[in-house]
Amino acid sequence: MSVKASTRQSGSVIIIDLSGQIKLGEGTAVLRDAVKDLLGKGYKKILLNLGDVNYIDSITVGELISAFTSVRNQGGELKLLHLTKKVRTVLEITRLYTVFDVRDDEAEAIAAFN
């Protein structure tokens, strides 16, 4: 299953809804390009909705870190929303769960942006 991404806006927050398997190749490129495009358009508040992502690999973990760093370096914030059990487990094993601001409620996540 390939990865799909769509964007929507809630106030000043852009939500990227991702679904499928994010892994080396097309999947990581979709994630990278979506974040890069939004930063290029001046958006600084990005919420990655991973509720329909059923698989990530180590390359994807690297892409999440890269996206987080890129957004922060542009003076923005990146948060994660609706982690599936598999994605949450990967982030916990790699001890990155505490690096990201992870939310389970979309309204709460949007309100948490500065």
Where do the model's predicted regions map?
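Short beta-strand/loop segment at the start of cytosolic alpha/beta domains
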Residues: M1-D17
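Short acidic/polar alpha-helix capping motifs at helix-coil junctions
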Residues: M1-S2, V53-Y55, E106
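Short, flexible active-site-adjacent loop segments at beta-strand->alpha-helix junctions, enriched
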Residues: G11, G20, T84, E106
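Amphipathic alpha-helical interaction surfaces in cytosolic regulatory modules
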Residues: I22-F100
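Short acidic-hydrophobic, aromatic-tinged amphipathic segments that line or gate anion-handling sites
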Residues: D101-D105
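A short, charged, amphipathic alpha-helix used as a generic interaction element across diverse proteins
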Residues: F113-N114
